[in-house]
A protein has these predicted regions:
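N-terminal helical cap/lid subdomain that shapes the substrate entry/recognition surface
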Residues: 19-134, 138-142, 155
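Asp-based, Mg2+/Mn2+-dependent phosphohydrolase catalytic module
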Residues: 1-37, 103, 130-137, 141-256
Length: 256
């Protein structure tokens, strides 16, 4: 478990802080048959080898692990603010605070972060996520990606050595759905329909959707009839009414 203290998914598919079953997303036998993934924050992160030196000029840490943590701090702040997909103000401020930018420079650093974090920068492959995808592929688990993106995500995932749509050098996804390409974005449940068409043999309630946003991913997956799982490696959502994991490596125990 990454970032200790995160409540992992029990083998019956439910998050059990304090021993209590949570949420409306239960499946009676707790076994799932396929997985859909968000891309940003789940498979790749904004490249810390770029953002580290950038924010170090404002007193921030350049350590990769600190920037990994900062992304999830930013996403938690974004979710608390119920911010839309296009509103990254709360994320930017939480990010620069998390990497310990000098307090009197945080507003300008957040603005610079906002102008630097382009779609193409979401390219740093999360090592344990890559390992998890390979393990799931070896088991024959059907997988796809559903991402709010800008037309670039299929190329980025392939170029970063994470996965590709169909057979190839890396892990095969049945489809990589990019919101810019299909014209609909999370939390609109219609975006998941493009992936579900590629998983016709599986009841949607037995498909996991793993994301890093409460507003976009958990809400969108629920509306589409999928079982949402939040990647929450630093226990930023202790009062969640949905399932959480600290790493994609924890998915193995949920799949039949």
């Amino acid at each position: 478990m990454v970032g200790g203290g995160v409540v992992t998914l029990a083998v019956d598919g439910r998050n059990r802080p304090g021993g209590a079953s949570q949420g409306p997303d239960d499946v009676s036998d707790g076994r799932f048959e396929a997985v859909l993934f968000d891309a940003g924050g789940v498979l790749v992160l904004p490249d810390p080898t770029v953002l580290g030196p950038l924010l170090a000029a404002y007193g921030g840490s350049a350590e990769i692990d600190d920037h990994r943590r900062a992304h999830y701090a930013g996403m938690a702040a974004k979710s608390r603010a119920a911010a839309s997909e296009s509103d990254w103000d709360s994320y930017n401020l939480a990010y620069v605070e998390s990497v310990d930018v000098d307090p009197d420079l945080r507003l300008i650093a957040a603005s610079i972060l906002d102008h630097t974090r382009s779609a193409a920068l979401w390219r740093w492959a999360i090592p344990e996520s890559v390992r998890a995808l390979r393990a799931l592929e070896e088991r024959g688990v059907p997988m796809s990606v559903v991402s709010n993106a800008s037309g670039q995500i299929a190329w980025v995932l392939s170029h970063s050595g994470v996965c590709q749509e169909g057979p190839g050098e890396d892990v095969a996804m049945r489809i990589v759905v990019d919101s810019h390409v299909v014209g609909v974005a999370k939390p609109d449940p219609r975006i998941f329909g493009f992936a579900l068409e590629m998983h016709p043999e599986t009841d949607p309630k037995r498909i996991l959707y793993v994301g890093d946003s409460v507003v976009m991913d958990v809400a969108g997956a629920r509306a589409a009839g999928l079982h949402p799982v939040l990647l929450d490696p630093f226990d930023d959502h202790p009062d969640a009414d949905f399932d959480r994991i600290g790493s994609l490596l924890e998915l193995d125990g949920l799949l039949g």
